[in-house]
Structures are given as structure tokens and as C-alpha cells.
Amino acid sequence: GFMIQGGCPDGTGMGGPGYSIKGEFAQNGVKNDLVHTEGVLSMARAMHPNSGGSQFFIMHKASPHLDGSYAAFGKVTEGMDVVNKIAGVRTDYSDRPLQEQKIKSMTVDTFGVDYPEPEKC
């Protein structure tokens, strides 16, 4: 596959936090120059542009067809070997890993910038 996805609070791949946030990408009227190259983090969503909540995906391979349509917001700076390992595990018919994969720890570096809460819809 081209990405790995996570962030569903109930573990089904269909759940969310009970709210959604505005999609911050060009097709939704928001300037976002971060492109979907290997290691980029982006918000997962349903068909509606403002349907993102807690689910996200990490690019395993460059996917320029997502640029402007999904809200890229970060990049893996260490641990792409882990991303690649997860991307290579055996999956079922719907691309879910046969063995559960969990992020045990993560650090977010905002480089000193304080970002506001995202706009909820």
C-alpha cells in the first residue's frame, strides 16, 4: 500500500472523536503546501471535506494524487523504518493488519510555534 492509517478510538477504522474539524487543504479553500511524500502525516476523512477527526495516515510512498485534497500536517523525522515495517505486515481482505499495530510513543515538535485548536464543524 501507499500509507498506513490509525487514530480510530474504537479500533474499527470507522470511529472518531464525536466531532469533526475543517479540512485544511486547497480544495477546501485553505492554503497547504505540504505534499504527500514518504513520511508525511495527513488527516483521514470521509467523502465530506470537513469530516476529519482523530484518524490520520502516514505516507509509505509518495502519493501526489492526494495533494490539495487531504490535509497534510506533519512529517516523520525518525522511525521511517518502523513505518515501512508496519506497511509490510500481512493484512486481511480490507487491508487491516492481521496482528494489531500500535504506536507506543510519539513526540510532536512544533519548533516553538503555538498552534490554535483546529476549527470544529
Write out the residue ranges for each language-model feature:
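Cyclophilin-like peptidyl-prolyl cis-trans isomerases
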Residues: 1-121
